[in-house]
């Protein structure tokens, strides 16, 4: 009888012990996932990659970009000495997988900027993005009235594009659906789409 009682007690202790270990593992796993996500998402600057590019324009300067982002960019490329048209390209690494790059071109004393946002497509996946009406986009872009940004948004499911490139003459936007397929579109200063391409 004593042996039976002892066996039951030991079995109960073992079950409690295993349950406790299981809960601890789950908690640790959730904590690690949360920490990982926070590390990926937290920007080193004053804004994340999507906010930063919206605050920049083609007439910006290196000093202005530093002020907006919050730290100095790293020089990653430049023109050869003696070139008629010179440029310098800087990068601001905001996280391990997102950054802003700005190419400053100087010609006859005038400086213009080309701005790009780098980020993984996974960050902007959206199951509301609909590429089933691409033919309608083709029809509109070739029409006499052209294709406006608002019309583009409506045709692809009502989803706003993610700005990823800014120049003097155009803005480029991208969208990614739930399957990871993307569609990029370029709009001129008049708000008309001049070209779109991607994997749909």
Residue ranges of predicted features:
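A cross-family detector of function-defining hotspots
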Residues: 45, 62-110, 116-119, 147-200
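Short, recurring structural edge motifs at helix starts
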Residues: 49-54, 88-90, 135-141, 172-173
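Secreted/surface-exposed cysteine- and glycine-rich disulfide frameworks
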Residues: 56-59, 140-149
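Positively charged n-region of N-terminal signal peptides that target proteins for export
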Residues: 1-5
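C-terminal motif of bacterial Sec signal peptides marking the signal peptidase cleavage site
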Residues: 17-20
